[in-house]
């Protein structure tokens, strides 16, 4: 209902300025007009609410209800508002409850049925985003290390945010900032050369069966063998200087890891462009030079750093963001600054981004706050551009502690996904047996995979990303509650109704639709909130808003399905109700796609 909302807001603003806001108060009005109208907090309050009279009462030192009475009388004289609104009434100390006319809602439903996007508008093409990109930096595993549950959160939250921006019409660049550079490669390459010295001439033939064990063995030698440690440090210098054999060994390690990552991305159906830390190596020196030139960089105890405004240590002293270590080496902050500057730089010398979104765990919040502050002070973030950190909490076990194996190790992501699919298959086979129903192996395998992977994704996305959440296969695979199986089952139910009744868009006669049942209007109002939910996520980057909306939509539809005789009554009544089924199906399918969850025709 964004179109209605905008029209309503504009009319309210015009009426306020014409009738209540005196010239000397217009500057104050500009500060408060942003949230002039909001969605009603409860259904009984109508469709929207306006609390401006409470705010104005403080400015004018007047009774808010008296202001509301005068405002409503003026609003009723506005033709646009009288065409949109069935009722305007005062509630409580001075709230104005707004209820839209039924005919306005029906016209909106007709429009959404015809719209392949279920009423969600494309972003405006005449603004900064018409040529510039939105960059979403997510997933970002490290070479020679296994992807774990922390990478799951970054990967699926980042994927969903990317999908929502793409759906809105933005040019989105999904970047995988993998950890493919750093001092750890010295020990890995040294270990590689020690184990496969004779094969390095034919490096493509080397297969490292278990990179994680290879990493652990390398680390153990580095911690315990002085001579190996010395050679590893020398290897880092050779790698950074571009030694041919070192580069080849480094590429081998990256390629082996990439195969592992790609298997998981295939399972999760994730599309992402790899651009690792190494890509920014040529730009690191210029970061130091630019910060020096702008007199932002300070040398402290041999290291070059920027002291951050408003960020202090326990002693109350300003925190430093170290840009270059005292040994001359660079670190994550240097690379992140180089990446940020490159991404905002215009093409062909950069990505030409208008907005950059980083999806990482909340443990990196201070790091990114420091990086963003330095970038702003260096004027690397254009005035009309935006940068956001999207932090998320930990995945915990049902005991409330960090999710680990029984042995205390971090759970591998591929093992977790396999276990979910396995349990989904077991549940499906039990259900088929209870229903005395036979399905072939392809059906069982595909359905198990869709439910198992979808359940893991949805369980994560449905949480407020900022908080920790407890991982439970039992809860996420349940057919009851706010779960992927519940949504998928509801969608299968609706799709079956529409298939049996040939409810294609071409078959719907929109001119004859009409509604009278209370549950019809509840479903209509829920369906018309879809665009507002999507646009709100674009602003605050909280995908759980879409999950909450879908759960409420499914509950509303199921009450409608159970209590309203959809296929009975006169033909116009039947078509009107089937029209709501068709729009619910479309909205559910689009939404699940935005969450990265595949759908099923049968379960």
UniProtKB/Swiss-Prot annotation:
Record-listed E.C. numbers: 6.1.1.19
Keyword Lipid metabolism belongs to the record: no
Subcellular location: Cytoplasm
Sorted UniProt keywords: Aminoacyl-tRNA synthetase, ATP-binding, Cytoplasm, Ligase, Nucleotide-binding, Protein biosynthesis
Gene Ontology biological-process entries: arginyl-tRNA aminoacylation
Placement of sequence motif 'HIGH' region: 141-151
Enzyme class: ligase
Top-level division of the source organism's lineage: Bacteria
Pfam families: Arg_tRNA_synt_N (PF03485), DALR_1 (PF05746), tRNA-synt_1d (PF00750)
GO cellular component: cytoplasm
Reactions it catalyzes: tRNA(Arg) + L-arginine + ATP = L-arginyl-tRNA(Arg) + AMP + diphosphate
Principal cellular location given in the protein's record: cytoplasm
GO MF annotation terms: arginine-tRNA ligase activity; ATP binding
Subunit structure as annotated in this protein's UniProt entry: Monomer.
Family statement drawn from the similarity comment of this UniProt entry: Belongs to the class-I aminoacyl-tRNA synthetase family.
PANTHER family (alphabetical): ARGININE--TRNA LIGASE, CYTOPLASMIC (PTHR11956:SF5), ARGINYL-TRNA SYNTHETASE (PTHR11956)
Record protein name field: Arginine--tRNA ligase
Classification lineage: Bacteria, Bacillati, Cyanobacteriota, Cyanophyceae, Synechococcales
Gene designation: argS
């Amino acid at each position: 209902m964004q179109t209605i909302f905008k029209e309503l807001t504009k009319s309210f603003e015009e009426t306020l300025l014409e009738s209540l806001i005196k010239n000397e108060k217009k500057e104050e009005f500009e500060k408060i007009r942003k949230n002039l109208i909001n969605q009603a907090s409860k259904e009984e309050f109508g469709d929207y609410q306006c609390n401006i009279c409470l705010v104005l009462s403080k400015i004018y030192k007047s009774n808010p209800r008296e202001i509301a009475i005068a405002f409503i009388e003026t609003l009723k004289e506005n033709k646009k508002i009288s065409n949109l609104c069935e009722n305007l009434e005062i509630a409580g100390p001075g709230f104005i409850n707004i209820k839209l006319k039924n005919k306005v809602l029906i016209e909106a439903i007709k429009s959404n049925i015809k719209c392949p996007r279920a009423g969600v508008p494309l972003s405006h093409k005449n603004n900064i985003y018409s040529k510039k990109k939105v960059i979403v930096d997510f997933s970002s595993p490290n070479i020679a290390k296994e992807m774990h549950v922390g990478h799951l959160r970054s990967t699926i939250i980042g994927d969903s945010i990317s999908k929502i921006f793409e759906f809105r019409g933005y040019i989105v660049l999904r970047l995988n900032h993998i950890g493919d550079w750093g001092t750890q490669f010295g020990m890995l390459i040294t270990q590689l050369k020690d184990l496969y010295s004779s094969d390095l001439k034919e490096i493509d033939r080397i297969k490292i069966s278990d990179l994680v064990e290879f990493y652990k063995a390398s680390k153990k030698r580095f911690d315990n063998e002085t001579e190996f440690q010395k050679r590893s440090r020398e290897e880092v210098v050779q790698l950074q200087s571009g030694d041919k054999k070192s580069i080849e060994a480094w590429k081998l390690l990256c390629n082996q890891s990439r195969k592992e990552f790609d298997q998981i991305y295939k399972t999760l159906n994730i599309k992402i462009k790899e651009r690792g830390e190494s890509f920014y190596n040529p730009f690191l020196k210029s970061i130091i030079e630019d910060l020096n030139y702008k007199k932002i960089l300070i040398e402290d105890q041999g290291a070059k750093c920027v002291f951050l405004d408003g960020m202090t240590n326990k002693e109350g002293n300003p925190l430093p963001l170290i840009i270059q270590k005292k040994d001359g080496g660079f670190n994550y902050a240097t690379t992140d600054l180089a990446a940020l500057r490159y991404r905002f730089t215009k093409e062909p010398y950069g990505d030409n981004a208008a907005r950059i979104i980083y999806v990482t765990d909340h443990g990196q919040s201070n790091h990114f706050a420091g990086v963003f502050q330095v970038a702003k002070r260096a004027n690397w973030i254009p005035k009309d551009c935006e940068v956001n950190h999207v932090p998320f909490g930990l995945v915990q076990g049902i005991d409330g502690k960090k999710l680990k194996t029984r042995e205390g190790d971090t759970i591998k992501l591929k093992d977790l996904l396999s276990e979910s699919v396995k349990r989904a298959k077991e549940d499906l086979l039990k259900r088929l047996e209870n229903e005395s129903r036979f399905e072939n192996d392809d059906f069982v395998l595909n359905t198990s995979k869709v439910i198992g992977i979808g359940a893991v994704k949805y369980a994560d996305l449905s949480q407020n990303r900022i908080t920790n959440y407890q991982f439970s296969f039992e809860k996420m695979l349940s057919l009851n509650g706010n779960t992927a199986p519940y949504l998928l089952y509801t969608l299968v139910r609706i799709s079956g109704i529409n298939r049996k009744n040939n409810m294609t868009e071409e078959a719907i006669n929109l001119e004859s639709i009409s509604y009278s049942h209370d549950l019809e209007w509840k479903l209509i109002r829920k369906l018309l909130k879809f665009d507002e939910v999507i646009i709100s996520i674009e602003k605050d980057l909280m995908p759980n808003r879409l999950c909450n909306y879908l759960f409420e939509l499914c509950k509303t539809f199921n009450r409608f399905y159970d209590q309203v005789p959809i296929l009975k009554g006169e033909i116009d009544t039947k078509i009107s109700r089937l029209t709501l089924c068709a729009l619910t199906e479309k909205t559910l399918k689009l939404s699940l796609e935005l969450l990265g969850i595949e759908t099923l025709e049968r379960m």
